[in-house]
């Protein structure tokens, strides 16, 4: 089942492990399918470095760590859908993530040239956070892993902010259905206007705890 998670991996030659305080410790060794399975089982939580050694990315993520984060990301999701680019919403501890998956490795500089203005207009973080260059770059927690500080897992959500599948195992299988896109190679991108959105995530903490309580950890081993 962990094989589906490879599409959420950036750099394969290294990774990081989340500690109890939420920070990450670099592993300095390659990632493996066994480690991805351990991530799903909750034995450890993996952070993946978004940019590869070649300066490319297989995905991009908008990060909104704030109370209205899911509503803002839904707006971005709709904007991208209108342009023909599907994106996938994931809840996080303090807001949400919006993932785009690419059909082929794409230069980080190209991704930031395309999506950077959208992120800046809404005060969102964008991964990749760098346009390439030296260094290992920034990392992001891989989906479905147990956040070591909150003790919770966070699901992918549909437009109504409901989990796309009732169990983690089914959510992982759902990943095989997501559409991979070819990003545009644009010299510059105009910044879209803000939209108002009334979508709210009600009872965030309680809903996540209830969803986690329904999971069978042995089904992920």
Question: PLM ranges: what are they?
Answer:
Residues 72-82, 101-126, 148-170:
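Helical (often loop-to-helix) elements that flank the catalytic cores of nucleotide-handling enzymes
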